[in-house]
């Protein structure tokens, strides 16, 4: 945000401008006859933020979710994702598939008809280089039975010293080394820490963190302890 007096009005104006830009893109696709053969995705990179005069609470931007940008709570990482592709994606369909942005490149390769993209685009001279993502094209196209699923999803934010890992409905958030466990099936706002009641699940998710984490002097986070 710029230094303006009416930050709420500026935010509303930015939303209106973005809406107009999306409309211009859609109109241009239609004018060129490409609207029926173009996959259009509207999404975001993170939840609401507070910097620069932003006021997430005023607009209710987090909805039913807790947390902000650079936090591992759902409000910081769960984002809108709208896909539009006439004659391919069923209008009005809803999916509860758990996926992440690194799934988009495999998805784009898949819908473009590129086979064996993992081998084609892996730099074998770089140790560990490869695709972490899974194509979500089957879900987009209504073929849920063919959809592969992640065993878990993982996040780190050094700015807030938080680590998050989700497996199914279980979500472990580590804040400055302290693990907190939530069951998103009945606690989407992440209010009730049930780590003490489920130490076995905590330990399973902590083991995932220790497997996924790579130490970095630039991006430091505090690892959790095992129960």
PLM features per residue range, with description:
Residues 4-17:
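The substrate-binding groove and active-site-proximal loops of carbohydrate-active enzymes
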Residues 3-4, 27-88, 100:
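Histidine-centered active-site microenvironments of extracellular/periplasmic hydrolases
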Residues 48-72, 89-93, 97, 102-184, ...:
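C-terminal cap/loop subdomain of S1 sulfatases and analogous C-terminal strand-loop tails that border
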Residues 16, 20-23, 27, 63, ...:
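Solvent-exposed, polar/charged alpha-helical surfaces in well-ordered, non-transmembrane soluble domains
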Residues 27-34, 109-114, 141, 199, ...:
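Sec-exported extracytoplasmic/periplasmic mature domains
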Residues 15, 22, 39-44, 81-82, ...:
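Beta-strand elements within well-structured catalytic alpha/beta cores of enzymes
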């Amino acid at each position: 945000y710029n230094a303006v007096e009416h930050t709420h009005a500026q935010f509303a104006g930015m939303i209106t401008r973005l809406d107009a830009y999306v409309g211009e893109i859609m109109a241009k696709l239609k004018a060129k006859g490409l609207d029926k053969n173009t996959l259009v995705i509207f999404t975001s990179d993170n939840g609401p933020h507070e910097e620069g005069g932003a006021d997430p609470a005023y607009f209710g931007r987090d909805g039913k979710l807790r947390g902000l940008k650079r936090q591992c709570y759902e409000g910081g990482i769960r984002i809108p994702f709208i896909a539009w592709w006439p004659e391919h994606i069923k209008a009005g369909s809803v999916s509860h598939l758990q996926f992440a942005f690194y799934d988009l490149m495999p998805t784009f390769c898949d819908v473009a008809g590129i086979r064996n993209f993992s081998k084609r685009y892996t730099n074998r001279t770089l140790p560990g280089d490869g695709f972490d993502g899974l194509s979500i094209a089957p879900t987009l196209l209504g073929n849920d039975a063919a959809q592969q699923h992640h065993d878990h999803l993982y996040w780190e934010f050094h700015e807030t010293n938080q680590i998050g890992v989700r497996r199914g409905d279980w979500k472990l958030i580590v804040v400055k080394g302290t693990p907190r466990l939530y069951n998103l099936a009945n606690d989407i706002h992440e209010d009730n820490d049930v780590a003490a009641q489920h130490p076995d699940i905590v330990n399973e998710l902590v083991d995932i963190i220790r497997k996924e984490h790579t130490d970095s002097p630039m991006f430091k986070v505090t690892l959790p302890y095992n129960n």
